[in-house]
């Protein structure tokens, strides 16, 4: 094997402006159901850290609007149920191009960061 021997992804970071800090933290905790973690000593008091499975999500608070490039994806067992819950929470759903063997769509957190929601149970989109 060539290159760096990466073992896994440890965390993904998304940014939010300070005026949306509470809304973004609540969204990841209440809407997506991520487990909120205690932040290590020496890190910023703003923002929050979460865990979903073996990967962490770090929310940082930035003075400028966050970049709208890229996204991260989360796997769910029931895409239709997840879409229903996201819509009930007021989150928009954007369709995604079909990829064989998976169903998927996109949503955004209150700061506009894009999250792909996917399941490996079919080939049609939400």
What residue spans do the PLM features occupy?
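N-terminal beta-strand motif that seeds the catalytic metal site of vicinal oxygen chelate
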Residues: 1-25, 70-72, 124-126
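Residue-level structural signal for beta-strand termini and adjacent loop
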Residues: 42, 62-63, 120
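Short, charged/polar, Gly/Pro-enriched secondary-structure boundary elements
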Residues: 54-58, 112-115
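Vicinal oxygen chelate
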Residues: 1-7, 9-18, 48, 62-87, 89-126, ...
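Core segments of cupin and vicinal oxygen chelate
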Residues: 14-56
């Amino acid at each position: 094997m060539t290159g760096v021997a990466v073992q896994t992804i440890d965390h993904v970071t998304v940014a939010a402006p300070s005026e949306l800090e509470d809304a973004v933290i609540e969204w990841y905790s209440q809407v997506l159901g991520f487990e909120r973690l205690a932040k290590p000593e020496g890190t910023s008091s703003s923002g929050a850290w979460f865990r979903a499975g073996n990967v962490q999500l770090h929310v940082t608070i930035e003075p400028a609007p966050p970049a709208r490039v890229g996204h991260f994806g989360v796997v769910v067992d029931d895409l239709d149920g997840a879409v229903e819950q996201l819509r009930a929470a007021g989150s928009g759903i954007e369709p995604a191009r079909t990829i064989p063997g998976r169903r998927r769509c996109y949503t955004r957190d209150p700061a506009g960061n894009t999250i792909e929601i996917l399941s490996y149970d079919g080939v049609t989109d939400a």
